[in-house]
Regions:
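Short acidic/polar alpha-helix capping motifs at helix-coil junctions
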Residues: 82, 110, 172-176
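Acidic active-site catalytic centers that drive phospho-/nucleotidyl reactions
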Residues: 14, 109, 161, 199, ...
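Primarily NTPase-proximal linker/entry elements flanking Walker-type ATP/GTP-binding cores
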Residues: 1-108, 115-160
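Conserved catalytic-core segment of NTP-binding enzymes
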Residues: 116-119, 135-153, 167-277
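Short beta-strand segments
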Residues: 78-79, 161, 197, 255
């Protein structure tokens, strides 16, 4: 039946069983008998339903220039290794700079020399200052230095990279809490954003990553990368329908390719059409 075809299509895009069933149930309740038999009409109804589900979590990050007496905004970026976290920071730094904001970067992923070098090369290319220390140094002290420096220079926004914490390493999770404690000594309101960077291809595993990081440090937003190619990231629907703690965690940006311009604000309509295009009924 048409409904079964749609169900299969949703599962193919990594929406996950539980969320797929909820979507199909809602679709059945909404659609009249005629629509249920008509694949094109059903498809249209599905598209509207999916967009609605995502609209609640689509919230791009708006950063205002700093008021004269205000402290810099401090954004932490967290996530496991290999999700494109450092690249995301570089792209966001450029985006903010293009909006006329002054930006500073902190190379807090002190475990990987490559991460520090990568951030420094972004800094050179975009003419943005980068605070770094030797590999293996304490990332909390990098963050502390960076916040001090950002406050002294009066920048608008400081973007802090952190180690790619593997889920099993509880000491790395403790370290996240430590970085937060240290930064609060300089500004009680900091960090103003804690953004988890997720790889769009990990499917349902993304939910456990969100849960885990959110327990260590309350998340304020997600960036979902690697949505080019085969990863369909239907998992966003599962994220959109789950509350972590008391809130749903907004999707700030999505990464659809390697280019600097490929970090985009998350727009549900465009995302849903792209997702369904691959499954379009003939």
């Amino acid at each position: 039946s048409a409904l079964e075809d749609l169900e299969a299509a949703l599962l193919m895009t990594d929406v996950g069983m539980e969320t797929t069933q909820a979507i199909i149930t809602e679709l059945t309740e909404r659609a009249g008998r005629r629509e249920l038999a008509n694949m094109a009409a059903l498809y249209q109804a599905l598209q509207e339903l999916l967009v609605q589900r995502l609209e609640g979590v689509a919230q791009p990050l708006a950063v205002e220039p700093r008021a004269a007496d205000a402290l810099p905004k401090v954004f932490f970026f967290v996530g496991v290794n290999g999700v494109g976290k450092t690249t995301t920071i570089g792209k966001l730094a450029r985006r903010f700079k293009n909006q006329g904001l002054s930006v500073m970067l902190a190379a807090g992923d002190t475990f990987r020399a490559a991460a520090v070098e990568q951030l420094q090369s972004w800094g050179q290319r975009e003419d943005i200052p980068v605070i770094a220390q030797a590999q293996g140094s304490d990332s909390a002290s990098v963050a502390f230095d960076a916040v001090q420096s950002a406050q002294a220079k009066g920048v608008d926004v400081l973007l802090v990279d952190t180690a790619g914490r593997l889920q099993a390493k509880s000491q790395l999770m403790d370290e996240l809490a430590k970085i937060q404690r240290v930064v609060k000594r300089l500004d009680e309101q900091a960090p103003h954003e804690v953004i988890l960077v997720l790889d769009g291809g990990v499917g349902q595993n993304a939910l456990s990553q969100v849960k885990l990081f959110n327990q260590s440090i309350p998340l304020t937003g997600l960036v979902v990368t690697k949505l080019d190619g085969t990863a369909k990231a239907g998992v966003l629907f599962a994220l959109a329908s789950q509350s972590f703690g008391s809130q749903r965690i907004p999707v700030r940006f999505i990464g659809v390719g390697e280019g600097i311009e490929d970090l985009r604000t998350f727009e549900p309509e465009a995302f849903v059409s792209a997702l369904l295009q691959a499954e379009e009924p003939a």
